[in-house]
């Protein structure tokens, strides 16, 4: 093939308790050291032989994908429907996200444009905090964002994976911006 896209995640950079714990990270940001970062790093290393064969390799580091058809957004909608919505954890963690339509268009651009090579962060240009996200979701649904989901509740529901629900990344789409990608959904609103 002319191009190989290896689907990775922004977990590559590690997870942080709150947005102020890190600066914005583009594709040149350092590797993280937590478990999820190690998985992403190993996953990306496994794809590197494709480049040695002369194939254009893109390591697509995707953030939280928003869609009403599934995933995090759908899980957050249910509590808000019953006036029980609010931020997960402290609410101060960063949420580097992308709308499903932008994710699809990003992949199409990568397939069609040879300027994309190496790491590409598939995230919207403006990371938000979990508090911002919950407030915006409440506004869209006409519901208050009052009831935070405590870390303990997340741990009971998710077990070991809870750490990644109450922490976040502050990533930006450096490669997409450089190549003029047009986001349909650049901000939460």
Regions found by a protein language model. Give the residues of each.
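Mid/C-terminal beta-alpha module of Rossmann-like enzyme folds, strongest
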Residues: 110-160
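Active-site Tyr-X1-5-Lys
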Residues: 30-60
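Conserved Rossmann-fold NAD(P)-dependent oxidoreductase catalytic core, especially the SDR/UDP-sugar
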Residues: 1-34
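Alpha-helical substrate-binding/gating segment
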Residues: 77-85, 93-127
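C-terminal amphipathic/interface module of NAD(P)-dependent oxidoreductases
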Residues: 163-189
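Glycine-rich "substrate-gating" loop/helix at the edge of Rossmann-like oxidoreductase active sites
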Residues: 32-36, 63-70, 90-100
């Amino acid at each position: 093939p002319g191009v190989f896209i290896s689907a990775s995640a922004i977990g590559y950079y590690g997870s942080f308790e709150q947005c102020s714990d890190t600066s914005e990270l583009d594709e040149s940001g350092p590797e993280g050291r937590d478990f999820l970062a190690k998985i992403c790093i190993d996953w990306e290393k496994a794809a590197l032989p494709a480049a040695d064969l002369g194939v254009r390799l893109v390591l697509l580091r995707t953030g939280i994908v928003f869609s009403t058809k599934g995933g995090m957004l759908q899980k957050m909608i249910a509590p808000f429907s019953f006036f029980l919505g609010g931020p997960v954890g402290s609410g101060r963690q960063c949420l580097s996200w992308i709308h499903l339509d932008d994710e699809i268009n990003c992949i199409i651009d990568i397939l069609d444009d040879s300027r994309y090579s190496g790491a590409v962060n598939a995230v919207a240009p403006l990371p938000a905090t979990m508090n911002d996200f919950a407030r915006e979701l409440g506004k869209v649904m006409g519901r208050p964002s009052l009831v935070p989901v405590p870390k303990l509740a997340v741990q009971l529901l998710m077990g070991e994976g809870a750490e990644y629900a109450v922490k976040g990344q502050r990533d930006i789409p450096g490669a997409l911006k450089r190549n003029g990608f047009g986001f349909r959904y650049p901000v939460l609103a």
